[in-house]
Amino acid sequence: MQVTAHYMRCGYILEAERWRCPSGEIDLVLQCKNALAFLEVKQSKTHSMALERIGARQIDRLYNAAMAYLAAKQLPFDTNIRFDVATLDSIGTIEIVENAFA
């Protein structure tokens, strides 16, 4: 996956892909120096169209899935985490929004 390769070139370590639980699915979980990045990947004709596809309900599911991930991995709930969104447009260009829901 292009997005995974992009993050790994930047020094991130892939922890999980398509991690599933009853709360939802996380596309990618990546470890960076001081945080876990939970990543949602969206593809559409344009980057803005891809971002528009993420609503409040999906954000809640991502957050709940992230909490379930921390519990499953026995990580403390005060672990430094962030939520990134990667969008791919129709020609395969990647845009990353770090801390997208802050």
Residue ranges and their predicted role:
Residues C21-S23, C32-N34, D89-S90:
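A generic beta-sheet turn/junction motif
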Residues W19, K42, A100-F101:
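Residues forming the ATP-binding cleft of Hanks-type serine/threonine protein kinase domains
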Residues M1-E17:
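Acidic-basic catalytic patches of nuclease active cores, encompassing PD-(D/E)XK
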Residues I26-H47, L62:
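Conserved catalytic cores of phosphodiester-cleaving nucleases, focusing on short active-site segments
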Residues Q43-I91:
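Catalytic cores of nucleic-acid endonucleases
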Residues L88-A102:
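Short, low-complexity, polybasic intrinsically disordered segments
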